[in-house]
């Protein structure tokens, strides 16, 4: 672990935006590595940034945040990012996409290893995190048994998916 804002290190200001980390169902399990918690750098595309932290005490609202912010005390009920965890928080269930293998969502079905918890790597995936981020056969939003475990966009607007060119503006492409 290292301080991102350490004057003797990277010295990145608190105002400098950094990239987001991978918050996905299978990668989260691969990062946790059976409870060893030693693969966070290996299964991300952010490299060692996952090991960095800021000295939050320099923030003007630090005293308030220390007392009233949950921060790391959100105990997620499911692996991965906020999509699945928000749904799980409300209903303790995982959304399903019935018959996904015969639907337009078929390309978003993840390809996993026989262990069922790790994504299958391509033949040209780097052997080490030092050589680059892993490459997956299919890092999909759906499990092979059609559970929706990563962020999916609605088929209508508003959506992160823009409408199809020349199509109905009420729908996503």
Model segments located where?
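N-terminal pro-sequences and low-complexity stem/linker regions of secreted or lumenal proteins
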Residues: 1-173
């Amino acid at each position: 672990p290292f301080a991102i804002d350490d004057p003797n290190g990277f010295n990145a200001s608190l105002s400098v935006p950094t990239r987001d980390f991978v918050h996905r169902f299978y990668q989260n399990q691969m990062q946790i590595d059976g409870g060893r918690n030693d693969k966070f750098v290996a299964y991300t595309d952010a490299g060692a940034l996952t090991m960095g932290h800021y000295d939050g005490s320099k923030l003007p609202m630090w005293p308030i945040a220390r007392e009233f912010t949950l921060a790391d005390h959100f105990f997620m009920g499911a692996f991965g990012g906020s999509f699945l965890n928000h749904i799980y928080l409300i209903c303790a269930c995982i959304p399903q996409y019935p018959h996904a293998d015969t639907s337009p969502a078929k390309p978003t079905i993840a390809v996993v290893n026989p262990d069922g918890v790790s994504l299958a790597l391509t033949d040209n995936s780097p052997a080490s995190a030092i050589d680059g981020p892993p490459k997956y056969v299919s890092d999909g939003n759906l499990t092979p048994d059609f559970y929706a475990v990563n962020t999916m966009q609605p088929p209508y607007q508003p959506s992160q998916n823009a409408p199809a060119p020349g199509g109905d503006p009420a729908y996503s492409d």
